[in-house]
Amino acid sequence: MRGASVFLLAALAACSPGERAVAIPSPSSAVTVPRTSSPTPTATPAVRYVAIGASDTVGIGATDPVNGSWPARLAALLPPGSAYVNLGVSGSVTVQAKDAQLPGAVAQRPTVVSIWLAVNDMNATIEPASYRDALAAIVNELVARTDAKVFVGNVPDLRGVPAYQDADKVRLFALITAYNDVIATVTKGHPGRVVLVDLFIGSAPLVSTITVSGDGFHPSDEGYTLIADRFATALRAAGVPLRP
């Protein structure tokens, strides 16, 4: 499995050099969805949404990362009066997110949390077992210390992404499958609280030419729209109130 990771690391290095860790926005710059009318006894409850992730959570590749990332697009669908905090850090692997993002997420007292972390771990040659331990630690802590519903995205089929054009596609697919098996196992451990957001099945539109940005790796505006749609579908199915 480690050999497959070396192929991924080489491909990423060729297409996305020098990526620095940048977090936006901080909890102090959380966004509150404006109220459009005075609350009534039948008003839809507000949501406290926190996003945990890496550069795709930050919105790298979008024309306007702050407003065009997939979490920001998802937050735009929240009921009036809801709060949204994006804790994503570009370049983060899952164990780093556990240390740097999880405490802030718990402190926000969220009712909804999204997690999308995996590809950087794959590119960093982190074995699936180690990835599992880090992801499970994040999920278990959120379940134990918050009342949030947690939505965890898996890995799309990356074989058509330009950054992986020189990777061994058989090994790449095997590694994606191993990581997605881990994500499925972790999410199944908390039925009713943790939901798998499947970005793999039918993922061809997510990795088409128009949905990948000019760097050949991160999503474009069109890609972030499709990712937000996948998460929105999962949130609605789990009973989270979202606007049409």
What are these regions (language model features)?
Residues 1-7:
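Bacterial N-terminal signal peptides that target proteins for export
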Residues 11-14:
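C-terminal motif of bacterial Sec signal peptides marking the signal peptidase cleavage site
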Residues 88, 92, 117-118:
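Cell-envelope and extracellular/periplasmic
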Residues 96:
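Active-site-proximal substrate-binding core of FAD-dependent oxidoreductases
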Residues 76, 99-244:
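Alpha-helical cap/lid subdomain in secreted, periplasmic
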Residues 24-90, 102-109:
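Serine-esterase "nucleophile elbow" of acetyl-processing enzymes
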Residues 16-19:
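Bacterial signal peptide processing site
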